[in-house]
Design a protein with these regions (language model features):
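Outer-membrane beta-barrel proteins and related beta-barrel translocases across Gram-negative bacteria
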Residues: 1-169
Length: 169
């Protein structure tokens, strides 16, 4: 398992004296592997924080995730396949917050994913070339939020990640 906790204080010198500080206390992050065998792994993670900024703007979040991913399954034709099931429970409340209400908001999100790839090798007289075409099918039966106005970038490094936009809520 892995457990991290603490508190953080930020100072923004651009703000007026009353709104200059942001307090994050406490915050925690706990993760553990619940099951790991020859078929795959089941992982649990919970993280939360209380954030106070602009004198009276309070936001409290608790996020729980439960992920199951299979080990790679090799077919006779050379395909490497795996699938994953991802559940996320988001609990948020805010006080004087523009994004969240003062009552507890709770969401259950999930994604089902199937990945497949086919490693290919080409031998020449002096070189060996490798290429691996990949495809990922995802189903999200939950409501999806619109992040098109956010400044997020999808690159070749994160295109196959489950959280490729790097969004925490």
């Amino acid at each position: 398992y892995n457990f991290t906790t603490g508190l953080t204080i930020y100072e923004n010198l651009q703000e007026k004296k009353n709104d200059r500080y942001q307090y994050v206390m406490p915050f925690y992050d706990f993760s553990t592997s619940l099951l790991s065998n020859e078929n795959g792994g089941l992982n649990f993670r919970t993280k939360g924080r209380n954030s106070l900024k602009d004198t009276n703007n309070l936001r409290s979040t608790i996020t729980n995730t439960l992920d199951y991913t299979t080990k790679d399954l090799y077919s006779k034709n050379g395909f490497i396949n795996n699938f994953g099931i991802y559940f996320k429970n988001l609990n948020v409340t805010g006080k004087n917050d523009t994004k969240y209400k003062s009552s507890i908001q709770s969401e259950l999100l999930n994604i089902y994913e199937i990945n497949s790839k086919l490693p290919l090798i080409k031998y020449n007289d002096y070189t060996t070339n490798y290429i691996t075409p990949k495809i990922s099918f995802r189903i999200n039966p939950s409501d999806m939020k619109d992040y098109s106005s956010d400044n997020r970038l999808i690159t070749t490094d994160n295109i196959f990640d489950i959280n490729r936009l790097g969004i925490s809520d």
